[in-house]
């Protein structure tokens, strides 16, 4: 038998695939939750890009922009019933707070911080005042999985390493925007230095063992 070829689908997976067969047992409510989970990453990517554009161009978000954001999600392929099922009001408020604070603090969005090919990362929003010796890093979370401040400590350490500014030479504030709340942390120089030491030590270990191979 000559089977039909679906070249455009090769290497891709259906939203409800055979390998994730548990959807066979779903009722409509469970199916809706499953689909919301399936689209969560895509929604996060879209919202991050909206935030990036607004912070970059210094255009604040207002409550009346909620429908515009919803329209962007729809235009990017997110089903309307998924948007209705998630806490979109809370999600938009969280996005608005993150964007407007980023603009207020004159931050730069999506900045890559690099130490080596083994250690680099992208800060959602970052600003550094050479006058005040103050580092500010904000992270935006669109999902509900509990965030950890360690991620931002790594960014602070990467900043220190890339720009050769010792942790004791600057103060910092780290923020995570998630589920309508803001987690604040003012790390000590010792906290950041501990991460710096770990990064440099692990980088040497990786490079040494890679060279041996």
PLM segments and residue spans:
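Hydrophobic, Leu/Ile/Phe/Ala-enriched alpha-helical segments that form helix-helix packing faces
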Residues: 54, 95-99, 159-163, 206
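Charge-rich, solvent-exposed alpha-helical interaction surfaces
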Residues: 91-94, 198, 205
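Internal catalytic-core helix/loop-beta-alpha segment
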Residues: 86-129
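Accessory terminal regions of nucleic-acid processing enzymes
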Residues: 204-213
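Nucleic-acid nuclease catalytic cores
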Residues: 111-197
């Amino acid at each position: 038998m000559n089977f039909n070829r679906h070249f455009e689908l090769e290497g891709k997976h259906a939203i409800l695939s055979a390998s994730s067969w548990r959807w066979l047992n779903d009722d409509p409510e469970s199916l809706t939750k499953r689909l919301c989970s399936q689209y969560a990453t895509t929604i996060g990517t879209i919202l991050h890009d909206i935030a990036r554009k607004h912070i970059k161009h210094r255009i604040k978000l207002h409550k009346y922009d909620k429908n515009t954001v919803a329209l962007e999600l729809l235009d990017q392929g997110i089903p309307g019933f998924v948007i209705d099922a998630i806490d979109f009001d809370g999600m938009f408020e969280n996005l608005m707070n993150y964007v407007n604070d980023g603009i207020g603090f004159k931050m730069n969005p999506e900045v890559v911080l690099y130490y080596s090919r083994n250690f680099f990362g992208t800060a959602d929003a970052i600003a550094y005042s050479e006058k005040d010796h103050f580092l500010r890093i904000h992270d935006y979370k669109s999902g509900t999985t509990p965030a950890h401040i360690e991620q931002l400590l790594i960014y602070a350490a990467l900043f220190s390493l890339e720009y050769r500014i010792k942790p004791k030479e600057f103060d910092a504030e780290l923020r995570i925007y998630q589920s309508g709340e803001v987690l604040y942390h003012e790390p000590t120089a010792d906290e950041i230095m501990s991460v710096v030491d770990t990064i440099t030590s692990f980088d040497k270990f990786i490079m040494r063992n890679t060279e041996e191979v």
